[in-house]
Amino acid sequence: MTIHKEGYRSLFYVSAFLFLLNFLIYYFFPEASILQKTVLVISLLIFLVVLQFFRNPSRTIEINDNQIIAPADGKVVVIEEVIETEYFNEKRRQISIFMSPFNVHSNRNAVSGIVKFFKYHPGKFLVAWHPKSSTENERTTTVVQTKNNEQILMRQIAGALARRIVWYIDENSKVTQGEEFGFIKFGSRVDLFIPLDAKVKVSLNQTTVGGKTVIAEFYS
């Protein structure tokens, strides 16, 4: 278990603030031992909570070109047929994974291939389960084309708490299934838009593990 690089700055600021807070408490209230201990315990709890937000467990990924794997840890909250209007302009199967603040927040490539389309959208910060969060919130859209010419759209969506999306890919870059393509600080949601003829292997409310859980399979 390591700490993700996206957490270094946040952890530094949190540590500095908590250190200063405890220093001031000890300095101005030298006799208030109960207050000192209470603030210290609360500070440690806050630090541990923030620390777990940025944990980055090591995972062994088994690449399978016939599978679409989970891009994030979380829970499946949507499985439905929709018309995807940003890129495909046709019917696709949408599978959405909600990432709580207590999930690992790194995002992984669902398939291997070439990035055919990428776009960042500034936007609102509606709660992740809001029906319009997929189209109105801050988000990124990434389309990867596999070697078999299947196209998968992955959408990172910021939420009410997650107010910063990070990505590590560009159009025409080559990506590998299971490798990190981005990070959403403090959770939120990742949507997948897959072909209608792909066989879905997950169910609503199922827990997913990024890079491990098989979301769907392409028909051979």
From Swiss-Prot:
CC cofactor note: Binds 1 pyruvoyl group covalently per subunit.
The keyword Cell membrane belongs to this UniProt entry's keyword annotation: yes
Membrane topology: Peripheral membrane protein
Site location (Cleavage (non-hydrolytic)): 187-188
Record's GO cellular component terms: plasma membrane
An individual GO BP term: phosphatidylethanolamine biosynthetic process
Pathway per the UniProt entry: Phospholipid metabolism; phosphatidylethanolamine biosynthesis; phosphatidylethanolamine from CDP-diacylglycerol: step 2/2
Oligomer status and interactors: Heterodimer of a large membrane-associated beta subunit and a small pyruvoyl-containing alpha subunit.
Function: Catalyzes the formation of phosphatidylethanolamine (PtdEtn) from phosphatidylserine (PtdSer).
Protein name: Phosphatidylserine decarboxylase proenzyme
Species of provenance: Cytophaga hutchinsonii (strain ATCC 33406 / DSM 1761 / CIP 103989 / NBRC 15051 / NCIMB 9469 / D465)
Protein encoded by which gene: psd
